[in-house]
Each structure stands twice: as structure tokens, then as C-alpha cells.
């Protein structure tokens, strides 16, 4: 499946980032990987993947963000901002902590977790680079419309 998805993302010049699985990322020559706190350490992934691949990391605290950056992460996913159905065991991250992380690291920070068009306003003036959204798009009757609405809403508050 990852090979098929990668062919599609390449068609539109969009990087494919594989969540958690460095082996799958390598097998399909994906542009990068995103690593959670319980996945392979960022510094080891960087040694394996090299400097040209994108490595994202999850951070819930400023110390985790600083460590990920020091170990070679290119970007951070911070959250969950709200409860989410995609991660059963997750700890919520406050918007204040999100802002502190943005100020602490010089790499893009993206908010994640339970975000949708009705609650994304909470991220205004946080300095984040973007948002990561799954359920609000995948569970929508019209996923394309849902994605467009979230994109427009985020652009308005950024």
C-alpha cells in the first residue's frame, strides 16, 4: 500500500512521510518519517536515513522538543491539543506549552490531536507552522471539502 501511496504523492510533488515505521519509509524510499516518543530515537534514525530525509518527531514538552531538535529532527508534531480517536493513550498538551515549544526550537512546529474546523481558532497567535488532522477529514462525508475548510480556517488565523 505504501508504494501505491508514494506513487500518488510523487505525482503531485508531495513528500510522503511514514508514521513510526522507518523500515517502511526505507522500503518505499519515502521522503521521510515521523517518530513518536516510543519509536526509534531521532539521532539513530538520522544516522540510518542520512541528512536528506525528513525526520519529524513528537514532543509534548519543551525538554522533549529541545532533545528532538538537538538529535536532528526537522519538524515537530505537538499534542494532542484535544482528545483524539487516532491515539488511544495520549496526554493532552496545553496551548501554552505549544507556544513555549514554538519559542524554544528553530524548526517548524505543527499542532496535532482532535483538531477540526470548529476548534482550530484556539491555535491563533501560537506561531505554529501547520496542523495535522486525521479524523476531521477521514470521517467527513466530503473529505475534500473538510480539508479545504480546515486549510482556509488555519490560513485565517496564522
Predicted regions, residues:
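Catalytic cores of alpha/beta
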Residues: 16-31, 45, 60-72, 104-111, ...
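Alpha-helix-loop-beta-strand connector modules within alpha/beta enzyme cores
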Residues: 1-18, 37, 42-61, 89-117, ...
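Glycine-rich phosphate-binding active-site loops on the catalytic face of alpha/beta enzymes
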Residues: 37-44, 77-89, 120, 124-153
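Glycine/Thr-rich beta-alpha phosphate-binding loop at enzyme active sites
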Residues: 28-30, 35, 57-99, 103, ...
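A generic short-segment signal for beta-strand/edge and adjacent turn/coil regions
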Residues: 1-4, 25-26, 78-80
Amino acid at each position: 500500500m505504501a508504494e501505491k501511496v508514494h506513487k500518488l504523492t510523487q505525482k503531485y510533488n508531495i513528500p510522503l512521510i511514514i508514521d513510526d515505521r522507518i523500515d517502511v519509509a526505507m522500503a518505499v524510499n519515502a521522503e521521510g518519517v515521523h517518530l513518536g516518543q516510543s519509536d526509534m530515537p531521532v539521532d539513530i534514525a538520522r544516522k540510518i536515513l542520512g541528512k536528506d530525509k525528513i525526520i519529524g518527531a513528537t514532543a509534548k514538552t519543551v525538554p522533549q522538543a529541545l532533545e528532538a531538535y538537538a538529535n536532528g529532527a526537522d519538524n515537530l508534531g505537538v499534542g494532542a491539543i484535544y482528545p483524539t480517536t487516532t491515539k488511544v493513550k495520549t496526554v493532552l498538551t496545553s496551548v501554552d506549552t505549544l507556544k513555549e515549544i514554538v519559542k524554544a526550537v528553530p524548526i517548524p512546529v505543527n499542532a496535532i490531536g482532535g483538531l477540526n474546523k470548529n476548534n482550530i481558532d484556539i491555535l491563533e497567535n501560537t506561531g505554529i507552522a501547520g496542523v495535522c488532522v486525521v479524523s476531521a477529514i477521514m470521517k467527513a462525508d466530503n473529505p475534500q471539502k473538510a480539508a479545504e475548510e480546515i486549510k482556509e480556517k488555519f490560513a485565517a488565523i496564522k
